[in-house]
Amino acid sequence: MDATGAIRIRWDGERVRLWYAVSLVLRIWHAGLPARWTNLALFWSTGQPDLSDSIGPGDLRSKVELVLADAKDYGCKFRLWGLTKQETEQLEQTMPGMFRFQLDRDASDYIYDSQALIHLSGRKYHGKRNHLARFQRSYNWSYEDITPQNYADCKAIAHEWCVQNGGCGKEDGTDNENCAINMAFRSFEELALSGGLLRVDGKPVAFTVGEEINPEVYLLHFEKALNGYEGLYAAINHEYAAKNLENYRYINREEDLGIEGLRKAKLSYNPAILLEKYSATLRSETEEITELEQKN
């Protein structure tokens, strides 16, 4: 498995924001759903089945053929997304001519030099250092690692953030992500997750959660900070990295999902690598759509 964590397989329909948790989602199974596949995770949203699979050791052709058959059973169009360039080459080599690949900028991963995020050295991080310093001066804050004793505090932050951003109780990505966060905390240790929590005047106000992908790469899945505290995101970002991620070469902070503010924020930290991601559709289905459009 590389720095990206996983390949994601889904069918036609609106992409859900649940995929903030992409590589950990592979190992979460909702207790209310029957298991139909081995090493696959199925989620239901907006009436469409979303399927995720990791490309790693094993027979790639048999994995893809399995979900192709299932998509056909459901009468759904088939799509792969979150593919690296290397993975598109693997697919093309394994099943030549079957897929049409397209760059998906919204799904591309932001990968940072860990030392740059920890030390914020140099002119290009001048504004970040000042922002962090203002937070540290302005608030009575404390940091702690996430443990079973503060899981509830983190979930409370996630819920309050969801309410503040108008997502809870709605069929949108914000509510889906909050669901994924709660699922993650139910199996935190089993998933080998780790994270950090910030408090202001004793109140839990921000947390971050991730996992080690390999000895050189740490992947951050979730980062939530409540409104009303200037510099809070900068603070949780810095404190967790400084106290826990010194020994990693890279920190993968995942994609921006095409959200303008999120893209601006992630670019402002000067990623060392913007890892391009691709989607793949069946050439046969793409050609059918093109023919229909031409007829109409």
Question: Regions from the language model: what does each represent?
Answer:
Residues 2-87, 199-229:
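Conserved donor-binding loop and adjoining core beta-sheet/short helix segment
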Residues 76-104:
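Non-catalytic accessory segments adjacent to catalytic cores
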Residues 193-283:
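Aromatic (often tryptophan-rich) hydrophobic motifs at membrane interfaces
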Residues 100-120, 252-296:
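Active-site/acyl-donor-binding loops of N-acyltransferases
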Residues 71-75, 140, 243-250:
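Short, surface-exposed connector motifs at secondary-structure boundaries
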Residues 156-215, 219:
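A mid-sequence, solvent-exposed acidic-amphipathic segment
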Residues 79-80, 144, 250-253:
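Short catalytic-loop micro-motif centered on adjacent basic/acidic residues
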Residues 97-172:
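Acyltransferase donor/substrate-recognition loop-hinge adjacent to the catalytic core
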